[in-house]
């Protein structure tokens, strides 16, 4: 049915409106100036018409708006200055690759899974204001994303778990990121090809480093200076990280409660580094490996 002429000027909530439908109408003329909630509006649809002129200045919630859709239309001029929730906005939107570099993201708090499995997206978003974002978990998981995001303000972020999981193209410079508030880095570079310098990252608030470099066959950076005094989980951290060969014996592992299979399959780790790591980590009763053999005088 043609609903292009509907008077929507008083509508405040359009959440889930067309979710899971086959509807693909012309909505370009709709007055959306009063709408505050657009979450899941077109999720799981074939929606792809022109909505470039929509007034989104009042919208605060766009989470999962285009999740699992065919959408790939121009929304570059949207006013996103009031949006706080962009969680999953383009989740599994495999066609989307539009220029959204000019979006005002200064109010955004959640970018969780925003581009999860959005395999086409590779636009420059280096200028985004991310100073209010607290959750970037899964943001670029399963993507081909690799633009420069070195200047992002990550000072408020607490959760980066699985942020680049299976993001096999990503290897940009993020050495200067402020990670001082991050508590969770679980699986951050799991099954990725990342090998950037993150030696200066402040991980003093992190409690979970499990799976961080699992199955990452490229990573081999010096992270010996990390403050790991609050970390409680290191299980699977370097599991099958076949290129990693660094001495991290200076790490404080006094709070770690699980090292399970931390280095299983880390075939690149030298015997000398195994010895050094063992001599420090062995003071923790939960240490997983019997690597004393690598410290024998005959080695």
Placement of each model-derived feature along the sequence:
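Negatively charged
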Residues: 1-299
């Amino acid at each position: 049915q043609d609903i292009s002429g509907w008077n929507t000027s008083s509508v405040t909530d359009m959440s889930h409106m067309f979710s899971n439908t086959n509807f693909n109408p012309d909505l370009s003329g709709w007055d959306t100036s009063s709408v505050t909630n657009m979450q899941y509006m077109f999720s799981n649809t074939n929606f792809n018409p022109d909505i470039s002129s929509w007034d989104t200045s009042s919208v605060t919630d766009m989470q999962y708006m285009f999740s699992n859709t065919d959408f790939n239309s121009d929304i570059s001029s949207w006013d996103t200055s009031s949006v706080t929730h962009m969680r999953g906005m383009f989740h599994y939107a495999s066609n989307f690759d539009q220029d959204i570099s000019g979006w005002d993201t200064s109010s955004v708090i959640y970018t969780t899974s925003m581009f999860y499995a959005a395999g086409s997206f590779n636009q420059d978003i280096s200028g985004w204001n991310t100073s209010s974002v607290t959750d970037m978990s899964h943001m670029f998981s399963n993507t081909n994303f690799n633009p420069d995001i070195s200047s992002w303000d990550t000072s408020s972020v607490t959760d980066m778990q699985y942020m680049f999981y299976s993001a096999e193209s990503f290897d940009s410079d993020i050495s200067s990121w402020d990670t001082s508030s991050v508590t969770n880095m679980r699986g951050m570079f799991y099954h990725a090809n990342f090998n950037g310098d993150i030696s200066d990252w402040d991980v003093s608030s992190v409690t979970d480093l499990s799976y961080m470099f699992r199955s990452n066959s490229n990573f081999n950076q010096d992270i010996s200076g990390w403050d790991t005094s609050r970390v409680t989980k290191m299980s699977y951290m370097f599991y099958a990280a076949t290129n990693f060969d660094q001495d991290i014996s200076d790490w404080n592992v006094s709070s770690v409660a699980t090292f399970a299979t931390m280095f299983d399959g880390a075939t690149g780790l030298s015997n000398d580094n195994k010895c050094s790591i063992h001599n420090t980590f062995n003071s923790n009763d939960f240490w997983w490996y019997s690597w004393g053999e690598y410290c024998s005088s005959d080695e």
